[in-house]
C-alpha cells in the first residue's frame, strides 16, 4: 500500500509538500471582502489587473529556487496547475472581473491526517482557486487508498455574507481596532466561511483565527467535520486587518510559539497554553519597514516561516532578526530568498501546504 497523505501538525519532519506558482497572477478588482484588507495609503488601493511579467518572473525564480532547496533536502515537491486568472468569473449571484492566483496553497488546502480539505474561501476572486490543486489531489486519491479528498460547502458569497460599507474611509485606526476587539469583522455569520490559512494544526487540537476570512460558523463546521479533534477559536485584537494566522501566531515545535508582538494573544486565551507548559514568546522585529510594492501583506511576513522538522526552520533570508532569534532558540536556520514572491500571496508558510509529514496524531494539550 502506498501512503501519500499524512500530516498532523506544523513541525513533524516534512517529506512531501506543494509549492505554489506565480504564473498568470492578477490583482483582482474590488469586492466586498477585499476592500477592508487594504491599509490606508497602500499602493494596492484602486489597482487591479494582471501583474507584470517581470514581477511574475522574479517571483517564480524564487519559488523554483525554494522548490529545489527542499528537494535537495529529500523533500518531494509538487506544483499546482495555474489557470488563466485574468478572466471574468461568475455564479448565479455575482460576477468578478478576474481571479487571483495559485502562489499560496496554504490558504486553500488544509491537510489533517490522511485528509486534504478544500476550504470554502471567503473572496469571490478566489472561489475557483481550488481547481489549481485538483489534479494533485486526484492523483493522491488514485494512488493512496486511505487518502480522503474533501471539499467544504461552497459558499454563495452574496452581499449578505459581508457587512455593508465595513471600515469606510471615515473610520479611524482606533475605531477599526475597537471593532476588531468587539469581533466585528467584514464577514457575517450568514454562511460557513473559512480559509485554510486561519487554521493551525497541533495534533488533536486545532486553533482557528476568527477574523476577516473565517467566521464562527466556519469554526463550528470544522469542529463537526474533524470530530476527533478539539477546536479553539482565537482572535488577536491588535490586528486591524486579521487575515490568516500564520504571520501572527507561529508554532516552531511542541511547547514553543512565536507571537507577533503587535498582535498579542489575549490573556484569557493563553490559559490552555500555560496549563500545558507551552511558551509563547514575542517574534523578532521585521528587518523591513515596508512590504514590497503591490503586496497585500504586512511586514510581519518575517515570521511566516516553514518548519522542516523540530530542529530546522526555513526563514526568508533578508529577515535577519527573525533568523537570529530562531537560531538563538536552538534551530538550524535555512535562509531562503523569497521577498520577490511576497506580493503574490505571502512568505514561506503561505507558499506551501503539507502533503506528508512523519508522525501521528498526538495530544499536546492534555489539560483542557
At which residue positions do the language-model features occur?
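The feature marks the mature, well-folded catalytic cores of soluble enzymes
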Residues: 1-368
